[in-house]
């Protein structure tokens, strides 16, 4: 009896859609789910598909060619560990487990180490694109043993999204947790993109009182230019969607933004690495403060502030917001890729930043036209310290920074919260500052804690008795 080249464990929507994606590329796929009903449901809903159901782990594992390729699409955390433990008794040395869940990269490093010691291969794989991407072609970020990746690369390449130039949106990222780390930073950048767009929306509503139809038209125009991206594209559609009562749906959605924790992971890692991920972290905090709805409503009746005044010429202000949004986006990516560089050095991953930008060009949530500019920047100078220093991005900063400053100044004067736009200005000015007031902080630290300091006019480390 012939055996399958790959099996998928976990038949929730992402696992189901990836299995169907793999099947559509000409493979017969073994499928397994902890609950029998889920597996039966997938088979019943997809008659004629080359999906072969199994109802015991042993039969599932034995149905696969060796070395076995098993894609796990189960709940991250304890669920992943439990799935791995259930598979191990039936695996042979050299078999490959691919974890496609939203897994914390440190867990992937641990699992890679533990499974490698037992003779198994483990590939932690970031998968971006949501339900539709899983079915039609996601962006895929695999990390683990390079030789194991080579054995699964033909399948991953076939199921990945394809960019406009025909390149598949998958590449080997690096050892152990590199793939899941890049996916984590991707999600952090996604948080930043979404909050920047939300602030642009708030400015256009508060400053110009644009209607939903006007907002949709504005975003349509933006999507035809340098802001062209998946998130801008879907946002234009959101503005005009109505509910069953004829109300604009976006206007009746509660203003509390939920999260699944991946943005927080990105910010926590930035703190561990000493990376100033300010814009992305502000986007995480913006979601947190949005969840304080009752407190915000109460505070709105107590705390005073300015009432928003008209922002002036409509076309001029829209263009300023567009420029501010694009430069803010550039700052967000500059921070994210700077963090990737720091992580690559810390964990010895040897990341290829240009290739990472390339696989974000299709399939994933942050796909955008300007990602090619990032790839070009790293092709020109692979060692560039920060994307803001690349010629294209430097020119945009030169041309657009005044618009960003004007928009932030207007927002502050008119009581419109713009935490990520503000963070973009602060980061840009801090990064370009040859001198910062940190000398005073060092003096304070030495004063109360004898933490010492360095001088600009002498070599060495110094301490002063400040009360003498």
Swiss-Prot record:
Annotated positions binding substrate: 102, 128-130, 186-187, 191, 260, 287, 445, 451
GO cellular component term of the entry, any: cytosol
Keyword ATP-binding assigned: no
InterPro entries on file: 6-PGluconate_DH-like_C_sf, 6PGD_dom2, 6PGDH_C, 6PGDH_Gnd/GntZ, 6PGDH_NADP-bd, 6PGdom_BS, NAD(P)-bd_dom_sf, Pgluconate_DH
Gene Ontology biological process: D-gluconate metabolic process; organic acid catabolic process; pentose-phosphate shunt; pentose-phosphate shunt, oxidative branch
Protein name: 6-phosphogluconate dehydrogenase, decarboxylating
Effect in UniProt of substituting residue 209 to S: In strain: ECOR 68
Root EC class: oxidoreductase
Family classification: Belongs to the 6-phosphogluconate dehydrogenase family.
Catalytic activity field: 6-phospho-D-gluconate + NADP(+) = D-ribulose 5-phosphate + CO2 + NADPH
The protein's annotated pathway: Carbohydrate degradation; pentose phosphate pathway; D-ribulose 5-phosphate from D-glucose 6-phosphate (oxidative stage): step 3/3
Record annotation: effect of changing residue 117 to S: In strain: ECOR 70
Effect of residue 55 to F: In strain: ECOR 10
Gene3D superfamilies assigned to the protein according to its UniProt record, in alphabetical order: 6-Phosphogluconate Dehydrogenase, domain 3, N-(1-d-carboxylethyl)-l-norvaline Dehydrogenase, domain 2, NAD(P)-binding Rossmann-like Domain
Subunit description: Homodimer.
Cross-referenced NCBIfam families: gnd, PRK09287.1
List of catalytic residues: 183 (proton acceptor), 190 (proton donor)
Consequence recorded when altering residue 170 to F: In strain: ECOR 10
Lineage: Bacteria, Pseudomonadati, Pseudomonadota, Gammaproteobacteria, Enterobacterales
């Amino acid at each position: 009896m012939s055996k399958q080249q790959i099996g998928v464990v976990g038949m929730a929507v992402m696992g189901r859609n990836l299995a169907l994606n793999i099947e559509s590329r000409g493979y017969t796929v073994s499928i397994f789910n902890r609950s029998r009903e889920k597996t039966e449901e997938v088979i019943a809903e997809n008659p004629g598909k080359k999906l072969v159901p199994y109802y015991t782990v042993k039969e599932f594992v034995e149905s696969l060619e060796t070395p076995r390729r098993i894609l796990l699409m189960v709940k991250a955390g304890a669920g992943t560990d439990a799935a791995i433990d259930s598979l191990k008794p039936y695996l042979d040395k050299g078999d490959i487990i691919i974890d496609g869940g939203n897994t914390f990269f440190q867990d992937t490093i641990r699992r890679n180490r533990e499974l490698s010691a037992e003779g198994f291969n483990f590939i932690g794989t970031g998968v971006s694109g949501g339900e539709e991407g899983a079915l039609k072609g996601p962006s895929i970020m695999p990390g683990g043993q390079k030789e194991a990746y080579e054995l699964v690369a033909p399948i991953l390449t076939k199921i990945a999204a394809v960019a406009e130039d025909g390149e598949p949106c998958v590449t080997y990222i690096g050892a152990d947790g590199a793939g899941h780390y890049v996916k984590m930073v991707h999600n952090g950048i996604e948080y930043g993109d979404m909050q920047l767009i939300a602030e642009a929306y708030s400015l256009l509503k508060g400053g110009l009182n644009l209607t939903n139809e006007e907002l949709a038209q504005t975003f349509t125009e933006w999507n035809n230019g340098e802001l062209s991206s998946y998130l801008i594209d879907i946002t234009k559609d959101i503005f005009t969607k109505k509910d069953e009562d004829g109300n604009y749906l976006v206007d009746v959605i509660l203003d509390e933004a939920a999260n699944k924790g991946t943005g927080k992971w990105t910010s926590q890692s930035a703190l561990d690495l000493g990376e100033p991920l300010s814009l992305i972290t502000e986007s995480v905090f913006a979601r947190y403060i949005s969840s304080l709805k009752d407190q915000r409503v109460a505070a709105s009746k107590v705390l005073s502030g300015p009432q928003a005044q008209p922002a002036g010429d409509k076309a001029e202000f829209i263009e300023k917001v567009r420029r501010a949004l694009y430069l803010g986006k550039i700052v967000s990516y500059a921070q994210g890729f700077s963090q990737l560089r720091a992580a690559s050095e810390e964990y010895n991953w040897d990341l290829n930043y240009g290739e990472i930008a390339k696989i974000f060009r299709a399939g994933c949530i942050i796909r955008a036209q300007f990602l090619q500019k990032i790839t070009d920047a790293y092709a020109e100078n692979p060692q560039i310290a920060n994307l803001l220093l690349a010629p294209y991005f430097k020119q945009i900063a030169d041309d657009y920074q005044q618009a960003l400053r004007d928009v932030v100044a207007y927002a502050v004067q008119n009581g419109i919260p713009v935490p990520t736009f503000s963070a973009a200005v602060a980061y840009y000015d801090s990064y370009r500052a040859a001198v910062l007031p940190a000398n005073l902080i060092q003096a304070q630290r030495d004063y109360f804690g004898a933490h010492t300091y360095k001088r600009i006019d002498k070599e060495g480390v110094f301490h002063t008795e400040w009360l003498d």
